[in-house]
Amino acid sequence: MITLSTLKKYKKEGRKFSCLTCYDAMFAKMMQNAQVDTILIGDSLGMVVQGNDSTLPVTVEDIVYHTGNVSRSNKHALILADLPFMSYVTVEDAIANTRKVMQAGAQVIKLEGGAELSEMVTTLTKAGAPICVHLGLTPQSVNVFGGYKVQGKSDDAAAKLMSDVHAVVAAGASLILLECVPASLAKAVTEAVDVPVIGIGAGADTDGQVLVMHDMLGVTHGRTARFVHDFLTDERNQKSEYAGSVEGAFALFHNSVIEGSYPQAEHQFN
């Protein structure tokens, strides 16, 4: 079974780790069979499961429901879960909603934000809830950003992100997740902190890589993000012992991350 201690050990050893989003029991079981290291019950479910155009409508009850589905069916992966939009405005809200999600089976709680989360991170960590802080492109703030855009491109923005990372790590964050930032910035962050860093659209040098399950299976509509690769139709999966199955796509993703063949330069932002 993968734990936070396992991920910290992997970081020290230079061994990459895999992460996929998941929302139900059957896919969770397949991910266990494929040895995927970590699973995120993400508020991305608002878009890929519920059909919304953003993550904002997702509720705590939604996360609790899907976390239970996953945690009952996967006993291998470390399970992360989001607190959704406006569910942790106050420390009191954060404590109450963290309790609900962890009682459903989450082992790490993910929050979106920066240094302003420091007090909350410390409080939740002291209460026994490991925290992953999500920085860079944070989908819950899409209306503030004016759309889904690469973050940390200017010197000032990069310095601000690095400062935020140091603040939340000092406050007790157990993991960092960077989304859609230049690969060079993600590399600098990963080297600057002793906690594991997960990337999505953040280059190849982070400690772990995460993708939305539907994206990496090619189950998408409209424009596909630069960092997405379709592992289901990948020739390596088609020719593998899995014979092109979904479980094979999960295994190929996991192995590609560990071996360093994903992501490639074409998947990153400069």
Swiss-Prot record:
The active site is at residue 179. The keyword Magnesium applies. PANTHER family: 3-METHYL-2-OXOBUTANOATE HYDROXYMETHYLTRANSFERASE. GO terms for biological process: pantothenate biosynthetic process. Catalyzes the reversible reaction in which hydroxymethyl group from 5,10-methylenetetrahydrofolate is transferred onto alpha-ketoisovalerate to form ketopantoate. Pfam families: Pantoate_transf (PF02548). Binds 1 Mg(2+) ion per subunit. Pathway: Cofactor biosynthesis; (R)-pantothenate biosynthesis; (R)-pantoate from 3-methyl-2-oxobutanoate: step 1/2. InterPro entries: Pantoate_hydroxy_MeTrfase (IPR003700), Pyrv/PenolPyrv_kinase-like_dom (IPR015813), Pyrv_kinase-like_dom_sf (IPR040442). This is 3-methyl-2-oxobutanoate hydroxymethyltransferase. Its EC number is 2.1.2.11. It comes from Psychrobacter sp. (strain PRwf-1). It catalyses: 3-methyl-2-oxobutanoate + (6R)-5,10-methylene-5,6,7,8-tetrahydrofolate + H2O = 2-dehydropantoate + (6S)-5,6,7,8-tetrahydrofolate. GO terms for molecular function: 3-methyl-2-oxobutanoate hydroxymethyltransferase activity; magnesium ion binding. It is found in: Cytoplasm. One of its GO terms (cellular component) is cytoplasm. Mg(2+) binds at residues 43, 82, 112. Keywords: Cytoplasm, Magnesium, Metal-binding, Pantothenate biosynthesis, Transferase. Its cofactor is Mg(2+). 3-methyl-2-oxobutanoate binds at residues 43-44, 82, 110. Its main location: cytoplasm. Homodecamer; pentamer of dimers.
